[in-house]
A protein has these predicted regions:
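Accessory DNA-engaging acidic/polar modules
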Residues: 1-158
Length: 158
């Protein structure tokens, strides 16, 4: 039914405004792609739709939109760690719990991993098709720069 379909695409009902909505972020993709996606799914399931933008309408009809990326490596500023995020958990969750230093964050419902383990996170991300957020990329580059600039010393015996 209609409600199940829009809920499966992560839309929520606003009882005050009497409409379905979805907050969009860097991770969800563009408005036009998400509008085309929900339009396409509604059409495929026999619902009539009305989209006022002709380009988005064509994308909805043809299914020609960028698929939503549902697995992300984000940067958690509060914990200063890389955060593995799933829109829907899958087999990669168990694998993430094997990365050294992982910790489940109950507040964010993500798996946090200290940035010093960025190589393991990168390997994991490649294997399980996770995308890095811009903030995570910046944090990793900053960490690598700090490591390069660390002064190595040899302590004399006294």
């Amino acid at each position: 039914d209609f409600n199940s379909l829009v809920k499966s695409k992560h839309y929520k009902w606003d009882s005050e405004d009497k409409c379905w909505y979805r907050n969009l972020t860097e991770q969800t993709g563009t408005y036009s792609d998400r509008a085309a996606e929900i339009g396409h799914e509604l059409l495929r399931n026999g619902f009539c739709i009305c989209i006022h933008d002709p380009d988005i309408t064509e994308k909805a009809i043809n299914g020609d939109y960028k698929k939503e990326i549902s697995k992300w490596v984000k940067w958690n500023e509060k914990t200063q760690s890389l955060a593995l995020y799933w829109l829907v958990k899958d087999e990669s969750y168990d694998a993430s719990r094997k990365i050294v230093g992982n910790r489940y964050n109950f507040d964010t419902q993500c798996v946090d991993i200290h940035i010093s383990h960025y190589r393991a996170v990168n390997n994991f991300a490649k294997k399980y098709n996770f995308q890095f957020s811009e903030a995570a990329i910046v944090a990793i580059e900053q960490y690598k720069e700090e490591k390069r600039n660390m002064r190595k010393v040899k302590v004399k015996d006294v």
